[in-house]
Amino acid sequence: ATKENAWKTPEELLVEYMYHIPKKEYKEMYAMLHVEASGSISQEDFIKRNSAIYEGIEVQNIAVQIIAYDEEQMTVTYQTSFDTVAGTISFENKALFLKDEEGYQLVWDDSLIFPNLTSADKVRVSTTQAERGEILDRNGRVLAGKGTASSVGIVPGKLENREEAIAQIAELLEITPEAIEKKLSAKWVKDDSFVPIKTIPRVEEIELMSISPDEEVLKEKERHEKLLEIPGVMISDVEVREYPLGEAAAHLVGYVQSVTAEDLEEYAGEGYTANSVIGKSGMEGLFESELKGQNGCRIYIENSEGKEKEELACILVQHGQDIQLTIDTDLQVSLYEQFKEDKSCSVAMNPYTGEVLALVSTPAYDNNDFIMGLSSEQWTALNEDENKPMYNRFRQVWCPGSTFKPITAAVGLESGAIDPMEDYGNVGLSWQKDASWGSYHVTTLHAYEPVILENALIYSDNIYFAKAALKIGTEEMESSLTGLGFNEELPFEIKMAESQYSNTDGIE
């Protein structure tokens, strides 16, 4: 016993021992043992056994309640509970102590971890992955769902001319040899292990059977064949997130990526593991908590014959929810095709219900590329593209131009500042209020008569609406625009930039 533990009661020592567990203070735990009575277990073996189990099941928030102490037998009966990756585990147990001239020491064996655990048993954790929910359009067509890709991997023991083979694989997969070597040098890798290197598009046989197969499909087929010619390379099917509309809905749907160390830290306790994916943008990010679901998990004891001996904890899998949008796939694609070469955003709404039927930002990127894994060169090219394909234009403010004229008309009519039947007179195609405007003139494209509100809207007359704005006045215009919701956050699932009618504090 250590000096600090000398003559502490067995009850106190047991509580202290248990509270070392979530702190991973295994050396301190070992120092409290009567080593000879504990089977002369070495400190190294003790730490290896305890850390593997407690950290494997992710123990935290431990609680201990002393039930009784048998002074004659020197046994402490206690109740303990702690949180794990599969929920709370709680059990009653007994701990034996021996006493010498230095104080009480704990007699340890595997049953102190779990009552029915022996040295020949193993504690296993089994995880059932939750299926991510689908993102659907208004008609149930998939915008984001399950797809299949090809996982290219290496069996290290089957590689011939390792350096040359890795160079070939790197070139075909458009990654560096160093990236491959890093994956092959992972601690878990053995000669007969399948080590996933990169996910690439799967070649569907039906696509190759068409009269004139797509050139990209043929190139992908050729790449598959060249990879499989290299000894040690294997290609297997793997389930991935797939975005059928690609560029047409990339900014709307967004994409998922594998979790990072930062994600695991930020979302600790929310069910993410090193193998999880997480929504990074668009609907995938916005509805992450609904889409991701909750993995199922079991902790159980397995005996020396590999059979389950006892279930310790279990959380049932909860698959992610499907999210249905008001978007119409056909309209979304149609708008994208019309404007894909332009820097633009397009919004289609049902004027009676307010439902958004399409949200398009162009130019765009293919969100499927993020699933396959972008190289640093591809990522740099995307971000440095002068057309900014990653920039989501439908979330930003745009100068409305002539679409603001109906708003000016509405403000004028509501305030009584303008009479819709008043003829402002034909002043030609250029006009200014007076000499105080200097060289500035308001221009328009069409001369017409009578110059009344209805015709001004038909001909989009800049001069008419300049005069109307002057009649309305600064104070009334600002007040009315504020009442219409300008300078406020739009009540919409996707966070939008706040609308504004001036680049300064008001209308000048």
Model-derived features: positions:
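Short helix-capping and inter-helix turn/linker motifs at the boundaries of alpha-helical repeat units
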Residues: 4-8, 326, 385, 455
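Extracytoplasmic/periplasmic proteins that interact with beta-lactams or build/remodel peptidoglycan
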Residues: 49-345, 365-389, 397
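Short, low-complexity N-terminal intrinsically disordered segments enriched in polar/charged residues
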Residues: 1-19, 23
